[in-house]
Amino acid sequence: MKITHITTYRLPPRWMFLKIETDEGVVGWGEPVIEGRARTVEAAVHEFADYLIGKDPARINDLWQVMYRAGFYRGGPIMMSAIAGIDQALWDIKGKVLNAPVWQLMGGLVRDKIKAYSWVGGDRPADVIDGIEKLRGIGFDTFKLNGCEEMGVIDNSRAVDAAVNTVAQIREAFGSEIEFGLDFHGRVSAPMAKVLIKELEPYRPLFIEEPVLAEQAEYYPRLAAQTHIPIAAGERMFSRFEFKRVLDAGGLAILQPDLSHAGGITECYKIAGMAEAYDVALAPHCPLGPIALAACLHIDFVSRNAVFQEQSMGIHYNKGAELLDFVKNKEDFSMDGGFFKPLTKPGLGVDIDEARVIELSKSAPDWRNPLWRHADGSVAEW
C-alpha cells in the first residue's frame, strides 16, 4: 500500500481536517490545526507531503521520525500540529486495514469508560451558574471555566475579588455536587498567580490550569509548593522533550497534551507513559473537533493515568459548526452519565461526512483569537 494524495480542508468554526488517500482505496482522516493559524499549518502539511507520497502508510513510526528529523529546524506549534494530524490519519488507515480500533492496536483497554468534562462560559456568575445547570441536565458533573479575565502583571484587589467572587458563588450554588477546574489561560503573571491561588484554595477547585504561561514553566513547582490544588498544564507544549523538562522539575499534577498539537497519537502515547512514570495524571486538551477528540479517546483508553477528557460540545468558539456536525456515526460519541465509552469502529472510529466537509470548506472563516488590551493600552494575554 502506498500514500497517493493528501488533501486539507479548513472548516468552521476554527478547525482543519486532512485526508490521506492510498492506492488501495483506504482513507485516513486527521485534524491538524493551530487555532488562528490554520493556513500556516496547512502549508506545513503540504510540505511534509513531499516526504509521504509514495510511502507505505503502515510505517507510522518511521514516517513520524522522517517528518520530525528530516528538517534541521524542528518542533514548535506549527510543525508539530502538522505532524499530529498526519499521524492521526496514518493510525486511522492502519486500524481500517487491520479491522481494529486504534486502542486495540496499542495493547487494548485499561478502562471501560472515561469521565468527560465540559467548558462553561459566561461573563457573570449568574451566567456561569445557568450554564452549569443546563449541562447537568444532560449528564455532566465536571466542568472547566475561566479563572479570571485579563490581569495586569501586578493588579489590584478588585481584579482578585472579581475572580474569587465567581468561584465562591458557584461553590455556594452547587456545593460538592459538581467539580470544576479553573483555567487561568496563561493570563496571569507569577506574582498574581500566587495571590489568586491562595484566595481560591478554600473553594477546592479540581485543578488550576496554566496558572502561568508555558514559557514561565519554572514557576510551576514554586506555585505547587504553596497550594494543595493540583496544577495542570501542557496544551502549549509540543513534544516529549518539552514535557521531559517540566516532569523533571516537578510541580505539575496533570499533563494536558493536545493530540492535534503535540505530534499526534504516536507522540502523546509516549508523553502519557512519561507522565505515569512521574505519578502525574493525564487529561488531554481538546477544544477542537471530532477527529481530535477521537484521537484523545484512544490515548485515554490505553493510558492508566488518564483521569478525564475535555470535549468541545457547546463551547463558545463553535460558531458555524458543532462538535459532531461532520460525523455520521454520532451515536458512537454519546455519553452515559458524563462518561465516554471506547470507540469500536476500525481506525479512529470516526465516520466523516465528506460531502459536508467539502461543502463547508468552501466558506471557512479565518478564525483569530481576540486581541485584548489593558486599561493602559498595553497588550494583554488572552
Swiss-Prot record:
Its EC number is 4.2.1.6. The record marks D258 as: Increases basicity of active site His. Pathway: Carbohydrate acid metabolism; D-galactonate degradation; D-glyceraldehyde 3-phosphate and pyruvate from D-galactonate: step 1/3. GO terms for biological process: amino acid catabolic process; D-galactonate catabolic process. This is D-galactonate dehydratase. The record marks E310 as: Transition state stabilizer. Binds 1 Mg(2+) ion per subunit. Pfam families: MR_MLE_C, MR_MLE_N. Belongs to the mandelate racemase/muconate lactonizing enzyme family. GalD subfamily. CDD domains: D-galactonate_dehydratase. It comes from the Bacteria. The active site is at H185 (proton donor), H285 (proton acceptor). It is an enzyme of class 4 (lyase). InterPro entries: DgoD-like (IPR034593), Enolase-like_C_sf (IPR036849), Enolase-like_N (IPR029017), Enolase_C-like (IPR029065), Galactonate_deHydtase (IPR023592), Mandel_Rmase/mucon_lact_enz_CS (IPR018110), Mandelate_racemase_C (IPR013342), Mandelate_racemase_N_dom (IPR013341). One of its GO terms (molecular function) is hydro-lyase activity. SUPFAM superfamilies: Enolase C-terminal domain-like (SSF51604), Enolase N-terminal domain-like (SSF54826). Its cofactor is Mg(2+). HAMAP family: Galacton_dehydrat. It comes from Salmonella typhimurium (strain LT2 / SGSC1412 / ATCC 700720). Mg(2+) binds at D183, E209, E235. Catalyzes the dehydration of D-galactonate to 2-keto-3-deoxy-D-galactonate. Reaction proceeds via an anti dehydration. It catalyses: D-galactonate = 2-dehydro-3-deoxy-D-galactonate + H2O.
